[in-house]
UniProtKB/Swiss-Prot annotation:
GO BP annotations, alphabetical order: photosynthetic electron transport chain
Cellular component, GO annotation: chloroplast thylakoid membrane; photosystem II reaction center
Signal sequence, start to end: none
UniProt cross-references to PROSITE patterns, sorted A to Z: CYTOCHROME_B559
Similarity remark: Belongs to the PsbE/PsbF family.
Cofactor(s) essential for the protein: heme b
Chief location category: plastid
Keywords, sorted A to Z: Chloroplast, Electron transport, Heme, Iron, Membrane, Metal-binding, Photosynthesis, Photosystem II, Plastid, Thylakoid, Transmembrane, Transmembrane helix, Transport
Record's protein name: Cytochrome b559 subunit alpha
Binding site residues for heme: 23
Cited Gene3D superfamilies: Photosystem II cytochrome b559, alpha subunit
Subunit structure, as described in the record: Heterodimer of an alpha subunit and a beta subunit. PSII is composed of 1 copy each of membrane proteins PsbA, PsbB, PsbC, PsbD, PsbE, PsbF, PsbH, PsbI, PsbJ, PsbK, PsbL, PsbM, PsbT, PsbX, PsbY, PsbZ, Psb30/Ycf12, at least 3 peripheral proteins of the oxygen-evolving complex and a large number of cofactors. It forms dimeric complexes.
Length: 83
């Protein structure tokens, strides 16, 4: 049988009032912060991904697909020039 590490048991933690006071504030706060991060568009700016209306522009309607493995760098340069 192993010795005690002196830590509180999981059942003791989740049945304490202090646990629920702390987590009843932090869990909804994290949810609201995440929702605001995405809904304001800040997530698109931080990670550099295009917004849903920016995937296809008027000048670029095709899918950037590389078709020739030996000319892939030239095709990538061509795709990047269209941005």
């Amino acid at each position: 049988m192993s010795g005690s590490t002196g830590e509180r048991s999981f059942a003791d933690i989740i049945t304490s009032i202090r646990y629920w006071v702390i987590h009843s504030i932090t869990i909804p706060s994290l949810f609201i912060a995440g929702w605001l991060f995405v809904s304001t568009g800040l997530a698109y700016d931080v990670f550099g991904s295009p917004r849903p209306n920016e995937y296809f522009t008027e000048s670029r309607q095709g899918i950037p697909l590389i078709t020739d493995r030996f000319d892939s760098l030239e095709q990538l340069d061509e795709f990047s020039r269209s941005f």
